[in-house]
Amino acid sequence: MLDLGLSKMALIGVVALVVLGPERLPRVARTAGALFGRAQRYINDVKSEVSREIELDALRTMKTDFESAARNVETTIHDNLREHEKELNDTWHSAVGGLNEGSVDAGTYGSDTPAAPSWRGSTAALARKRRNWRVKQAAMPVWYKRATTRRTHVQSGAARVARHQPASLRRPTRFL
């Protein structure tokens, strides 16, 4: 910062003593020290803020790089998956080529639209699953129902312990 040696500081002190006098010098020195301390704290705050912003900027760039790499990997995987799915569907349709055209979905074979995967199943099975959704909802375990339902009878911990404590361990009740 400033190159102030011991000799320069002594010279400044002597000049201040001559100019200000011995009665005002301590007050001015305290004020100057407080201002100097504030300036140092302000400079340190600015430095830390700048370094924090630089780190945040670096983290943001790393985040965008990571997201773009993840997106690239995802698109590559989806492209490879679509390619292999198309090959499998073409192989399947060539192996089942002896069947009549009524047995093959019109939208999956021989059209320009993307082929629906043959492994997804028929719509009849889907309709059956939709119809029986209530059966699955009713099979909730009792312990889960007890743990997640809203409590209507709330007790404190002490009351719960007293309720489940055997009579032989309870303290006798005395009124007088």
From Swiss-Prot:
One record GO biological process: protein transport by the Tat complex
GO cellular component annotations of the record: TAT protein transport complex
Transmembrane segments: 1-21
Primary site of residence: membrane
Positions of region (Disordered): 155-176
Membrane association type: Single-pass membrane protein
Keyword Lipoprotein: no
InterPro entries: TatA/B/E, TatB
Keywords linked to the UniProt accession: Cell inner membrane, Cell membrane, Membrane, Protein transport, Translocation, Transmembrane, Transmembrane helix, Transport
Signal peptide: none
Cited Pfam families: TatA_B_E (PF02416)
Secreted among keywords: no
Intracellular or extracellular location(s): Cell inner membrane
Entry's Gene Ontology molecular function annotations: protein transmembrane transporter activity
Entry's family note: Belongs to the TatB family.
Subunit architecture: The Tat system comprises two distinct complexes: a TatABC complex, containing multiple copies of TatA, TatB and TatC subunits, and a separate TatA complex, containing only TatA subunits. Substrates initially bind to the TatABC complex, which probably triggers association of the separate TatA complex to form the active translocon.
Function according to Swiss-Prot or TrEMBL: Part of the twin-arginine translocation (Tat) system that transports large folded proteins containing a characteristic twin-arginine motif in their signal peptide across membranes. Together with TatC, TatB is part of a receptor directly interacting with Tat signal peptides. TatB may form an oligomeric binding site that transiently accommodates folded Tat precursor proteins before their translocation.
Name of the protein in question: Sec-independent protein translocase protein TatB
Organism of origin: Burkholderia ambifaria (strain ATCC BAA-244 / DSM 16087 / CCUG 44356 / LMG 19182 / AMMD)
Gene behind this protein: tatB
